[in-house]
Amino acid sequence: MSLLDCFCTSRTQVESLRPEKQSETSIHQYLVDEPTLSWSRPSTRASEVLCSTNVSHYELQVEIGRGFDNLTSVHLARHTPTGTLVTIKITNLENCNEERLKALQKAVILSHFFRHPNITTYWTVFTVGSWLWVISPFMAYGSASQLLRTYFPEGMSETLIRNILFGAVRGLNYLHQNGCIHRSIKASHILISGDGLVTLSGLSHLHSLVKHGQRHRAVYDFPQFSTSVQPWLSPELLRQDLHGYNVKSDIYSVGITACELASGQVPFQDMHRTQMLLQKLKGPPYSPLDISIFPQSESRMKNSQSGVDSGIGESVLVSSGTHTVNSDRLHTPSSKTFSPAFFSLVQLCLQQDPEKRPSASSLLSHVFFKQMKEESQDSILSLLPPAYNKPSISLPPVLPWTEPECDFPDEKDSYWEF
């Protein structure tokens, strides 16, 4: 059976499952009413892209990233009938073993069914010979990880962190309500559109708590995670014992991601897996700026002044000269302070005991996100450089797509990860 033969093309809505009741008495002092969020329907132009499965309708512009253990190339492309910029993920299915094929199949199916503004959408999926093409909206700001590398090497401001985490946790809450564990929450799986919309990607790592119509309290699926993912994983997932893990494992990853956004570095990145597990198990939750859990470096990166980080690669924008940016606008003080509310959120997420961590729904009601009621979606745009999202801007010359004959670059050199 083909990878694409297993799901219905009617785009049936998945009915949300009732989440388990959680005990949150220990965090009530930090909770407020949950903010609301509206979502508009896709534009007519986007609807045309949704229906386009003709490979000749897409002009590949430039590769903007790698993913899926370096088996997938991610390209900026233009949908020629409408002029819409899109993202295309191209994977050679012949290079995928059975486990990877199942992961791809799962990601395609679940993205097809999920309908939430904070979950990355697959507009169209089709095959070109043995190559799988996945068409998604172009996220002009790329990933939060890319923003860190290019503009915020010493970490983001608390206001920007709040905007990014709020969208990510809303998407995560939707997944949890539908009985799914993401298992790969991190900055490189948080994408930002040119309109300031934050979405979660990385659905190939997702696992369902529902089996045979029953929602289980824990799962015992322990895949061979890439070492690049392990710093974000919870202690219970790394332990791989008889207790298993559940959706609270993702909450731990949210806490690590918050530390990543605050410091500009990935906690535990240079540690051996055993040392990492011991470090995560040994004591109380970590501070977002606890230097003992971050890789040591003799020198820190400086804010880039060479071009706008648009999500298509800084070198492309430098050569084309389409934008410039005022570095003062993106300046982050080297001596940063964070509010008690932010420290509280991180500490709650990083509790060793999963039962002591809040649910995603409760996390959205944390006082740290209270200001999101007053802030509009445009507020995140005021904290970022101008986005590269106008189809009228000239792009590098394109060539017809052909099957690659050379080896791909190392995944570690890529800023985008899907």
Swiss-Prot record:
One CC-aspect GO term:
serine/threonine protein kinase complex
Localization recorded for this chain is: Nucleus; Cytoplasm
Name the domain of life. Answer: Eukaryota
Q: Which GO terms describe its molecular function?
A: ATP binding; protein serine/threonine kinase activator activity
Q: What keyword terms does UniProt attach to this protein?
A: ATP-binding, Cell cycle, Cytoplasm, Nucleotide-binding, Nucleus
Q: Tell me which PROSITE patterns the record gives.
A: PROTEIN_KINASE_DOM
Describe the location of the Protein kinase domain by residue ranges.
58-369
Task: Specify whether Nuclease is a keyword of the entry.
Answer: no
Q: Record's Gene3D superfamilies?
A: Phosphorylase Kinase, domain 1, Transferase(Phosphotransferase) domain 1
Which residues are recorded as binding ATP?
Answer: 64-72, 89
How is expression of this protein distributed across tissues? Answer: Highly expressed in heart, skeletal muscle, testis, liver and colon.
Q: Name one GO biological process term.
A: protein export from nucleus
Domain statement: The protein kinase domain is predicted to be catalytically inactive.
**Family membership:** Belongs to the protein kinase superfamily. STE Ser/Thr protein kinase family. STE20 subfamily.
SUBUNIT field: Component of a trimeric complex composed of STK11/LKB1, STRAD (STRADA or STRADB) and CAB39/MO25 (CAB39/MO25alpha or CAB39L/MO25beta): the complex tethers STK11/LKB1 in the cytoplasm and stimulates its catalytic activity. Interacts with BIRC4/XIAP. These two proteins are likely to coexist in a complex with TAK1, TRAF6, TAB1 and TAB2.
Q: What does this protein do?
A: Pseudokinase which, in complex with CAB39/MO25 (CAB39/MO25alpha or CAB39L/MO25beta), binds to and activates STK11/LKB1. Adopts a closed conformation typical of active protein kinases and binds STK11/LKB1 as a pseudosubstrate, promoting conformational change of STK11/LKB1 in an active conformation.
Protein name from the UniProt record: STE20-related kinase adapter protein beta
What would be the name of the gene that encodes this protein? STRADB
